[in-house]
């Protein structure tokens, strides 16, 4: 499941960019195809990494959230972002600086942010 490029990018977009709807995932700059996105979201839900709920403002739309299992991937994704920043030009240098300045504080903020979203 996690060896798939698209699954990790979806989790990254949820964790670091705040993407929560199908449309927000499609708007990512990687250009994921709709059939691949739908398949990976289904698999992430089936593996207990992501959960869904109906959007209160539009019951036809789903809101995706990371589960505790998904949030536990924060250290893995942080290391991947830092590795990419060390070896390639990355788009969000401010985020990389935050990670490098105090990785544990950054991770605590990510975890707390998702816990807050889950309690809404």
Protein language model features and the residues they cover:
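Canonical helix-turn-helix DNA-binding module
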Residues: 26-59
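Solvent-exposed, amphipathic alpha-helical segments
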Residues: 13, 49-51, 79
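C-terminal regulatory/oligomerization modules of transcriptional regulators
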Residues: 68, 75-120
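N-terminal helix-turn-helix DNA-binding core of bacterial DNA-binding proteins
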Residues: 1-33
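Basic, amphipathic "hinge/linker" alpha-helix immediately C-terminal to the N-terminal HTH DNA-binding motif
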Residues: 3, 56-80
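A general structural signal marking secondary-structure boundaries and capping sites
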Residues: 18, 48, 84-88
